[in-house]
Amino acid sequence: VGKHEQAIPFFQRTLALAPNFAEAHFNLASAFQNQDKIEDAIAHYQRGLALNPSYPEVHLNFGAALKAQGRLEDAIACYQQAITLKPDYPKAHYNLALALLQHGDLPQGFTEYEWRWQLPHHPPRNFSQPLWDGSNLQGQRILLHAEQGLGDTIQFIRYAPLVARLCGYVIVECQAPLIQLLTTVSGINQLVAQGETLPQFDVHVPLLSLPHRLGTTLETIPAQIPYVSQPASHHLKLDAPQGTQFKVGIAWAGSPKNPNNRHRSLDLAYFSTLFDIPGVAFYSLQKESPAAELVRLGDYKERIQDLSNQLHNFTDTAAVVAQLDLVITVDTSVAHLAGALGKPVWVLLNFDPDWRWLLGRETSPWYPSVRLFRQDSPGNWQDVFARVAESLSALLADNLQK
């Protein structure tokens, strides 16, 4: 970030001397973009492209800037122009996929999404067995393998029962913390943790390729909720303070490895606007470093029960969520877990959210129990929490009347 900040005056001086130097406009635009100064970036992309429209990489970056402003159709046009100039351009196809998916065009979006395997940071698995094409393979053994984050695995494991109808034996390779939870998903014959020796199989498919293979549209998303459940053997019990009428689980930070994490995660202090609502007990669903933020809350830390020492895997988290009335979370695996369990969950979204939450709607076709609270401008969490506080107070009032 510091290098981009230092580069801005250099490129500005260059343009003062040579205002028609397209590459300087592109470099300045990129530096502004990396500083989240999106309007300045867009202005210089436009000036530079008017001078030289032949760089596919610039159309790609311009599209990303437009998407960050919520101008999705303009962004799609930029990605398509980048592909016109350079048809075999994996990053442009990938960005186009994410934009089409966010727009709700799942068939075309998931078709383009297959280009992810051409990206340098996303190499495909090298199996001798063929990729499954979606056809009926009764009697065959299929391997479904997780490929991205924990939330992705929870979201797309919903396809296991559909695959089971077409194949004889379903093996799922997934992240170790999910193994016990996924034993409750129907259609799975065998679970293997990532890194363990795989059993014999005939065909394979990555989990996030299943919507493409099965021709999913917005209208045909398999959303039979719940499709995971709390294992019956689990006995983790929540303590509720005296006078508690409503139990709410909260999560405010996702994985720091996610490239969008600085936009989707937030400071725990924002939740303090909810802590004065009487009759509500709050439970932290965070694990590891974000849970340490609780000690900085001062007076408010008494309002939140820190469960991090009890949450060893997703079965533990599922046992807690099952006892809650509501989950309020940023876009993280907790949102997917609560949604897959059918628990009411309010998901707090940044202005340009992940593709799966679409745009301009409060509901999710993936999770019927989800309600979406969106930023109305980039970085504006204050208005989001004002709406959440109002909605939580109204929900409590409704519950008291029942």
Language-model features and meaning:
Residues V1-L326, D331-K402:
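Alpha-helical solenoid repeat scaffolds of the TPR/TPR-like class and their adjacent stem/linker regions
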